[in-house]
Amino acid sequence: MILEKISDPQKYISHHLSHLQIDLRSFKIIQPGALSSDYWTVNVDSMFFSLVLGSFFLSIFYMVGKKITQGIPGKLQTAIELIFEFVNLNVKSMYQGKNALIAPLSLTVFIWVFLMNLMDLVPIDFFPFISEKVFELPAMRIVPSADINITLSMSLGVFFLILFYTVKIKGYVGFLKELILQPFNHPVFSIFNFILEFVSLVSKPISLGLRLFGNMYAGEMIFILIAGLLPWWTQCFLNVPWAIFHILIISLQAFIFMVLTIVYLSMASQSHKD
């Protein structure tokens, strides 16, 4: 099907933007283009690759942690130590409270998002071709961070942590006061303050998830357009420069997601006395 779609750019692009989905009511694979209720479907490809990449990250760090040496470290240990120091430095500079969870959480967010973004550099037809010819699957997308369901799920996880630490440190009363007495500290403006603070609070996970999704979806779309619209002998002249530039985008988006997570949790952890 992939080879056939190359002659029709529109079908080729549509095919590469289709997820491998399962209907939860019948547990059957949904064919691309078929009508279905989005509320009862799961993007299996996004779930699979995000879990595989997360497991890969945890396994590598666990094995290196078990074999860590005090002498001259190996290349992998050195690389992981540099990443750890980089993340730890950012946490110390941005998080004002004391919480042993923030540094491991920030490291996990940074590496996991980076690995999911990195899948965008895999040749666009590689996994779809294997999934179709070997496993007879109708579609396959391999960049989890280009799926809005994944990015919003991660940002909602951060949002629930924001609510948890806000209530834990400031209490329910302090949280309520923060909603109705800021930015104008007068009861007359309570409703107006609540609307402003509620919009500001809810916009955090939405903007966090949409920012990552938008950048990665756009990057994936450019690779698909290059592969679907241009002759094969011209693709390398655009794919290679864009891939090199995209490495910066991949790293930057992982860094931004981590930084905003730290900043939001730092704001939630500040008491009224700070």
UniProtKB/Swiss-Prot annotation:
Gene name for this UniProt entry: atpB
The entry's keywords: ATP synthesis, Cell membrane, CF(0), Hydrogen ion transport, Ion transport, Membrane, Transmembrane, Transmembrane helix, Transport
Protein's GO biological process: proton motive force-driven plasma membrane ATP synthesis
A molecular function GO annotation: proton-transporting ATP synthase activity, rotational mechanism
Function: Key component of the proton channel; it plays a direct role in the translocation of protons across the membrane.
Subunit details: F-type ATPases have 2 components, CF(1) - the catalytic core - and CF(0) - the membrane proton channel. CF(1) has five subunits: alpha(3), beta(3), gamma(1), delta(1), epsilon(1). CF(0) has three main subunits: a(1), b(2) and c(9-12). The alpha and beta chains form an alternating ring which encloses part of the gamma chain. CF(1) is attached to CF(0) by a central stalk formed by the gamma and epsilon chains, while a peripheral stalk is formed by the delta and b chains.
Source species taxonomy: Bacteria, Pseudomonadati, Pseudomonadota, Gammaproteobacteria, Enterobacterales
Chief site of localization: membrane
GO cellular component, one term: plasma membrane
Membrane-spanning intervals of the chain: 44-64, 110-130, 142-164, 212-232, 243-263
Protein name: ATP synthase subunit a
Subcellular location: Cell membrane
Record's bilayer topology term: Multi-pass membrane protein
Family per similarity comment: Belongs to the ATPase A chain family.
Organism: Buchnera aphidicola subsp. Acyrthosiphon pisum (strain APS)
